[in-house]
From Swiss-Prot:
Subcellular location: Cell membrane
Protein name: Phosphatidylglycerol--prolipoprotein diacylglyceryl transferase
Primary subcellular site in the record, as a coarse category: membrane
Keyword rRNA-binding: no
Any GO CC annotation of this UniProt entry: plasma membrane
Keyword Membrane: yes
Membrane topology designation: Multi-pass membrane protein
Pfam families listed in its UniProt record: LGT
Amino acid sequence: MQLEIINPESTLVNDVVAHRVAFSIGSNFNIYWYGIIFVCGFLIAILTYSLRLKFHYKVPYDPGFYYIFLAIPMTIIGARLWSLAIGDAKDFFDFRSGGLAIQGGVIAGVLSAAVYFPLILRMPKYHIRDIDADGNVVIRQPSMWIYADAIIPTILIGQALGRWGNFINGEIFGAESTVNDLQWLKKAMPAVFEGMKHYFIEGNKTLFTIYQPLFLYESFFNVIVFVFIYFGLSYIKQLKIGFISMSYFFFYGVTRFSTESARAPQFSFEGTYIINSLLLIFGVLGALYVQFIAPLLRKKFLLDAIIEMFYKKKDQIHKFGELRKPEEFLFYCHK
């Protein structure tokens, strides 16, 4: 939902908030600030997780790069469908009128990744050499969870930047407040302070209601959470792969619960608490699975027997022949 009345007297807010159009190509094609911020969020996230894959996890980053060409359309489609479902958009193809819900984008992006990465990581050129506990050189297929840990938390970068696009569009407002309570905002960010005012006409007077800058709180919290789970959790050696990516869903649910309860009633959507609850539960169950259950399953003889029945390791090793050096053992496993 957007505010339609912008301060008619403040040139500051008109320059920053009311001008949703960054520039125009020709006379009819406008490029909006929201779109520019959206693209910048994507690019920064891509750069971040590519560096993470290359220098931290030391696995090929090409699969993550190629995933972009699947993730972008799937994310946009998912976000658009979700906006239609919650009533924030009326026409699927009218992208220029807004309506991209992050929940739908996240779900669509994760589902497409769950199909894409297991397939592409089977390709021998993406397998890596490593040293096992006995000092033997082995060839390993990187786990899909490594890419999940590198990529999924960077969604927070896009969310943090995207909230500023919401600000320019006149979206994401908190509860009603007072000028006195927001003096800190007036001093620190005058344009944001003015942008939180909703002007209306009552009789012969021009009045305004001022709202809490909820977009700013959520943007700041997203940055804090990103730094914590992306860098802080990496120093806890006891955590299994996949825990970091599952932490995103947990903290996302917590963040949305906190911010949705602080929204002004006219800017809330029905059903938001349900999907936030599901994402939070998914994060908790997923973290428990990758930390405790998955390691146990990998040690079970029965599971190994089932894998052997449906997946012929000898055939796979035969395909790896060109990768092996004379002194190397060839072994298929997950890192």
